[in-house]
Regions:
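A conserved short alpha-helix in the GNAT/GCN5 acetyltransferase fold that borders
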Residues: 143, 152-160
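Conserved acyl-donor/pantetheine-binding loop and adjacent beta-alpha core of acyl/acetyltransferases
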Residues: 78-135
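Active-site rim helix/loop that mediates acceptor-substrate recognition in acyltransferases
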Residues: 26, 35-58, 64
Length: 213
């Protein structure tokens, strides 16, 4: 039986965490068939900045095979996005050209490369109640064992200890299991943006006056 360990992320975890991001990058399912031309495309947005800017809020799940999950947090979303804009995104834009041609014909990778040049920093209101945000992904072999809940609870505990009043996260409208998972953890729907494969449900949870366990 596999033994799993939850620990703080280290710089050398980046490649493994990027792999997890890609393998869960098809609305929670395996994204490898769509990102073979650039397997790290998603990870550069949804993993790398957290490991760099919020190492104390970045947890890694690993087993004897390697990294199989992560839970990431940002204490102040607006400050995090400011650092992403000024410190992280310029490097992406310099390395990856903005795609041209008809966007309807772009590959998944081209769409992500376009996000490098045209990021979305949407923060649902009321911001003051949910200034922090979270992101989590687990490979299939690590799912259904309670690790997702434990990791999110640990990150939320860290946020609460630092004084955050609440945290939010975004869920694809096509990822119904994830919506149910977060609802069981006490997250409630804040707002829906877009529709279909481009739609996102933002959910929030108060961290005031309670343990998240």
């Amino acid at each position: 039986m596999s033994e799993f360990t939850i620990r703080l992320a280290r710089p050398e975890d980046q490649s493994g965490a990027y792999h997890v991001c890609m393998k869960t990058g098809n609305f929670g399912q395996d994204g490898e068939p769509f990102y073979r031309e650039d397997p790290d495309a998603l990870g550069r947005i949804f993993v790398g900045p957290y490991l760099a800017f919020e190492p104390e809020l970045s947890l890694i799940l690993e087993d004897e095979v390697g990294v199989c999950g992560y839970a990431l947090g940002a204490f102040d979303s607006r400050n995090f996005f400011h650092r992403y804009e000024t410190e992280w995104r310029p490097k992406l834009c310099a390395q990856f050209h903005e795609p041209t041609g008809d966007p309807a014909m772009w590959s998944r990778v081209q769409n992500v490369h376009s996000w490098y040049h045209h990021p979305d920093y949407f923060t649902p209101e009321p911001y003051e109640q949910f200034p922090s945000h979270l992101h989590i992904d687990l490979l299939e072999r690590a799912q259904g064992r309670g690790f997702g809940r434990r990791m999110l609870e640990q990150v939320m505990d860290k946020l609460r200890e630092r004084g955050s009043p609440g945290a939010r996260l975004g869920v694809s409208m096509l990822n119904t299991p994830a919506f149910g998972f977060y609802a069981k953890l006490g997250f409630r729907e804040l707002i829906r943006v877009g529709e279909g494969k481009d739609g996102c449900i933002y959910m929030g949870k108060s961290l005031r006056n309670e343990s998240v366990r």
